[in-house]
Curated annotation (Swiss-Prot):
Catalysed transformations (reactions): Exonucleolytic cleavage in either 5'- to 3'- or 3'- to 5'-direction to yield nucleoside 5'-phosphates
Gene3D superfamilies for the chain: Exonuclease VII, small subunit
Family: Belongs to the XseB family.
Subunit record text: Heterooligomer composed of large and small subunits.
Keywords: Cytoplasm, Exonuclease, Hydrolase, Nuclease
Intracellular or extracellular location(s): Cytoplasm
NCBIfam families cross-referenced by the UniProt entry: PRK00977.1-3 (NF002139), PRK00977.1-4 (NF002140), xseB (TIGR01280)
A GO biological process held by the record: DNA catabolic process
GO CC, any one term: cytosol
Record-linked InterPro entries: Exonuc_VII_S, Exonuc_VII_ssu_sf
Protein name: Exodeoxyribonuclease 7 small subunit
Amino acid sequence: MAENALADVKTLSFERAIEELESIVKRLEDGKVPLEESVAIYERGEALKRRCEELLRQAEARVEKITTDASGQVTGTEPLDVQ
C-alpha cells in the first residue's frame, strides 16, 4: 500500500480510525474482495489498529487517579494503575 495512504492514518481521530477499521473488518469477513485488494485493505487495517492502540496509550497516560487523605480531602493525583 502506498506510504501516503498509510501516512494519513497518523492524523485520524480515534473515533474515525475505529470506524474505518470496523468497515475493513466487515469487507474482509464478507469474502467478496479480490485478493490483491484484500491484502491492501488488511495492511491499512493494521495501520489503523496501531493508531487506535497509540491513541489509547496516550489517553491512559493522561488519566490520573485522585488521591485523598483519611478525612476524604483531595491531596493530589497519581497515575492510574489499570492493571
